[in-house]
Amino acid sequence: MKNILKFLLPILFLLNASNFYSHDLKGAIASDDRTPKNTLRDTYRNPYETLSFFGIESDMTIIELSPGGGWYTEILANYIHYPGTLIAAHFSADSDIGYYRRSRANFEQKISNNPMYGRVEIVDLDSSLGDLESVDAVLTFRNLHNWLGPKMDDIFSNTFAVLKPGGVFGVVEHRAKPGTSMEVMKKSGYVTEKHAIEIAKKHGFELVATSEVNANP
């Protein structure tokens, strides 16, 4: 069985069994544990509709690729609970790039300061991500433009390998106009839907659905 690819294009587009912080999805989004300034973006990022489209359930094992400052991590950590696990694939703490090291350190500090994140695991983005066929879904939000080139191939290949058969790769990205060149995509931070899907299919994914839920008005 091929793994499943779901795209949301364009964009403004754990807790143990007695986890105190676990909620249903709407409760996780409404939780006071979220950073107040992050909640202001809900109207644009549509987290309930987005995660529902990807079919995310609270007992899944999920990898979030390149979570940055943890905008979606705040929601997922509140939602995913035993026997599920949330795994954050972040920059390497030993990266030669200072921004990557600082971003990883800030993320680690964020999750260490709140018991809600007690079962969140961290792995390196440039690693194999985990054991073969070990996770139910892999998600990434507005990151593809940072990976254009060989890095995208590596990440997509590792993502396919770590997903269980029939697992979901959920992608949200800024959508470039059809025909946009690679050079412009790299400079603009926007990626054509065609290119993203082609790379995914190259690594074994099957596209099953796209959504306009995060489309600009």
Walk through the language-model features, giving the residues of each.
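Conserved Class I S-adenosyl-L-methionine
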Residues: 182-210
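A short glycine-rich, Lys/Arg-flanked "PGG" loop and its adjoining helix->strand segment in the class I
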Residues: 77-78, 153-168
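Conserved beta-strand signature within the Rossmann-like core of class I S-adenosyl-L-methionine
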Residues: 87, 166-175
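Class I SAM-dependent methyltransferase Rossmann-like catalytic core
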Residues: 25-58
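A short acidic, Gly/Pro-enriched loop at the edge of an enzyme's catalytic core
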Residues: 128-138
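A short, conserved alpha-helix within the catalytic core of class I
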Residues: 124-125, 146-159
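Conserved class I S-adenosyl-L-methionine
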Residues: 58-68
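S-adenosyl-L-methionine
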Residues: 99-129
